[in-house]
């Protein structure tokens, strides 16, 4: 009898312990669920090369702890790969122009750089790139300064030349230092195509200030084959941040060189606006890469893009830049209203001029986004 009572006590004690553990797990799940309700979900969407991932990295620098040394070092092979890939693209481009252009002679690489060019072409075609040594950096610099490569670079919009080209080519000696560790600025310029989904949690006013909202920002791949991965993220979104690279009105897609990037952006923007799950979702449109746009617009007419074919320049210099920007902005506004159901046009829609590489601009923009969304939440709660 005593043995039976002892066993029962052990079983009862085990049951009580298990019940306590279950209750604790349920309590934690309930707390986490409540906490999740206070976290607003933001989707960062846009076509490939729109600057989404640069904005994502800026958020990490601005509103989190930034990149530690290990993370900075992890970008070293990426940056070196960007250098090798870019010089290969330029070398390939110069060959193509030399064969097909009427004024072909100016695209022919000088005799002293031909051997270097072939060597770098072979390296750029490898799957694994060597460490960027001082010798290789000097050879790349020599080829970069070759008149034929500079003429090719001037036609970069016809090729797939990345925006980071100037920056990395100007810093080759530093990038090839034996003890080189990438800087924060280097990381912002580094180009890696986003595949899948990455996320970050932040507050634009700082974690210790109760007045600010907490956001979870999702960055998803912009190339066409990545977009199917967005679907499961569509539910319960507080706002969509759509990035449009306005400087790319004369460029083609990485994945389809017959397709204009701005036309692709327009169609993607309209498709997202029409999704039923976004009927009540706020939209923040970032007209990005303004720094490149303001230089390009003075050289390349806006009406080379089919969407902007009715554009008429009115001035020169700064006035023309503003006129062109306002025209693009108006086109996106028209697209928004044409793609939004009449009973939903009152949902929050804001447009911001952005330069993803400019930390001050990104910080100011996200504080404005935060204010807009907090105001919307107060209105919905009947507190305004």
Swiss-Prot record:
Lipidation, N-myristoyl glycine type: 2
Entry similarity comment: Belongs to the G-alpha family.
SUPFAM superfamilies on file: P-loop containing nucleoside triphosphate hydrolases, Transducin (alpha subunit), insertion domain
Residues involved in GTP binding: 49-54, 163, 188-189, 194, 222, 288-289, 291, 356
Obligatory cofactor(s): Mg(2+)
GO biological process, alphabetically ordered: adenylate cyclase-modulating G protein-coupled receptor signaling pathway
Chain positions covered by the region annotation G1 motif: 41-54
Cross-referenced Gene3D superfamilies: GI Alpha 1, domain 2-like, P-loop containing nucleotide triphosphate hydrolases
Chain positions covered by the region annotation G5 motif: 354-359
Protein name as catalogued: Guanine nucleotide-binding protein alpha-2 subunit
Gene Ontology MF term list: G protein-coupled receptor binding; G-protein beta/gamma-subunit complex binding; GTP binding; GTPase activity; metal ion binding
UniProt-annotated stretches for the region G4 motif: 284-291
Keyword line: GTP-binding, Hydrolase, Lipoprotein, Magnesium, Metal-binding, Myristate, Nucleotide-binding, Palmitate, Transducer
Domain called G-alpha: residue spans: 38-384
Its job: Guanine nucleotide-binding proteins (G proteins) are involved as modulators or transducers in various transmembrane signaling systems.
Organism: Glycine max
CDD domains: G-alpha
One Pfam short name: G-alpha
Annotated lipid attachment (S-palmitoyl cysteine): 5
Domains as described in the record: The helical domain (70-190) is required for self-activation.
